[in-house]
């Protein structure tokens, strides 16, 4: 197992390495392509700028050429006027002016053609340069390594175990029997052109046997022929109910409209498209054909055809599906008043149950919320008790520490503490003095808001000062008491330690 795990880990590491290499290669290729695109864009911009500059120079040259022509025309016009004013001199020929204009237009057209040819040559040159660059890039690219392993690896055999489908012996036997019957019946079919179209008729030799025993007809449904019983078809709604053979013989014409109406209703309810070509044989031997109307909607396939295809795909060989007998649509139009009342009662019961369930859920949520509140309050009370206990213990420890410090305190240390406190008191006095000066400065502020703010700050500082003074007085009195107590203890010890000799003293002498 450990070896397999090692091999799997190695394979995964190799796969990750290949994936990282492929990613690096793709990133490098993208960077190269981006760089080449940027270079090409820069070159295009440079070429366009050069073309624009050349066009500007050409336009300037053409303007310069056109300016002298205009000046010449301007000079010619006063000359014409002079010529006209002189009565003895004849005017110049207007043909010379038109020739000059034509020559100027021809020169301009030639210059434009030259410019266009130069631009075309530049475009061709640019395209050839790009082709050469692309060929160089293709030559510089590394050849593709076909031997390198790819990221995805597929096994030759994806499925390890293949189980053959189960074969149902009974269904296969029924299928083969139906096929044999169908083959025997199809051999007896003949085609007649009585109604102007191809109708399949069943020619039976033994008419009496067919009427008395089988009473089956051949049905064509979606290109498949099936032998069905007349009672089954009548129960489905394709044919009217059959009581006996005489009724079918006496009323052959009533069969067509009823069956057509029933077929149309069947297509509306079940959305099925089935063509039934049936022949019923009377005692005289005259065939009677049943030709239903075509369905209204042929877009949707019948449910029986879908289920039959699924059964073939699954391996079941039932030739006829059971869904052909049962209509999938349940409409309330066919219900009786009693059934409608029962249905209403059932709906009311369902609504009542739903309301009760919602009410029960709401009550459960309220109960849970109440329980949670009780638990939270108990937890909060417990926490408060714990905090109070901790504070009590901390206060007792602080008192013990203070007592131990007072007993073991040194006079020099006490003097240092006294000096420190004095220094702190002096600092506080200085701060209070500065604050007082600031208050005096703030007193001259304009507006009520500044005065109110200053008054509030002054009150706050006064309270702080008062509390500090009270604390200092308490500390001083406590220290004085402790010092008096200690001095008494020292005096008592000194008095007891003195060794007085036992002697008689006469206080009266």
UniProtKB/Swiss-Prot annotation:
Residues 335-375 form a coiled coil. InterPro entries: CCDC181 (IPR026687). Keywords: Cell projection, Cilium, Coiled coil, Cytoplasm, Cytoskeleton, Flagellum, Microtubule. Residues 243-266, 300-332 have a biased composition (Polar residues). It is found in: Cytoplasm, Cytoskeleton; Cell projection, Cilium, Flagellum. GO terms for molecular function: microtubule binding. Residues 58-120, 241-332, 345-367 are annotated as: Disordered. Residues 58-82 have a biased composition (Basic and acidic residues). GO terms for cellular component: cytoplasm; manchette; microtubule; sperm flagellum. Disulfide bonds: none annotated. Its main location: cytoplasm. PANTHER family: COILED-COIL DOMAIN-CONTAINING PROTEIN 181 (PTHR14320:SF2). Homodimer. Interacts with HOOK1. Interacts with HOOK2. Interacts with HOOK3. Belongs to the CCDC181 family. Microtubule-binding protein that localizes to the microtubular manchette of elongating spermatids. This is Coiled-coil domain-containing protein 181. It comes from Pongo abelii (Sumatran orangutan).
